Amino acid sequence: MLGSSAVFAGGFQLNEHGARSMAQAGAFTARAYDASAVYFNPAGLAFQQQNSVYFGSTFISPEIDFYGPSNLGSNKKTSMKNQVFTPIHAYVKYGITEDIHFGFGVYNAFGLGTEWDPAWDGRRISIKANLQTFYFSPTLAYKVNDQLSIGAGMNIIRDPIFYICVNWCENMILHGSFFV
C-alpha cells in the first residue's frame, strides 16, 4: 500500500482569451463562435457570417503562501507580495469576400508574475519573476467549402520578461522577440 501527502498545484494557466474560453476552461480550440478564433483556430473565422469586434480584460489578484523549512527547522510561512494582473484580449474579424476572412488579435497569452520578500527562504530560487507577453496576431482564413476551411496566422510577440534571485542564479532581463 502506498500513500502520499497532499499535493497542490503551483503553476499557472491563462484561459482569459474570451468569455467562452474561460467558461469552458480553455477547451475551445474546435469552436469558432466569435472573433477569439484568431487565437484558437483562425480557420474557424471563415464560418462566421458577420464582421465583429471582441474585447475584454480579466482582473487577477493571486494570494500565495509558501510553507517551508526555516533555518531553525520549523515550517515557516512566507506570503507572496499582493499583485494585480489584468490580461487583455481584443480581436477583429473582417470578411474580405464571402470565402476569404481576415482576423487580427492583441492579447496576453501569459500575464502573471511573482514577488517575494528579498529575505525569504527561497530567495536563491526566485525573488521576482514577471512573464507578461503581448501577442499581435494577423490571420487569414479561406473557406474551401461548407465543411472545410484553412487558416494561417503569425504571432508577433512582445515579451518584457524578467527574473531576479539572490546569489547563485543569474538575474535575467529579456526583451521583445519576433516569432513566426
Regions inferred by a protein language model and the residue ranges of each:
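Subset of outer-membrane beta-barrel
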Residues: 8-180
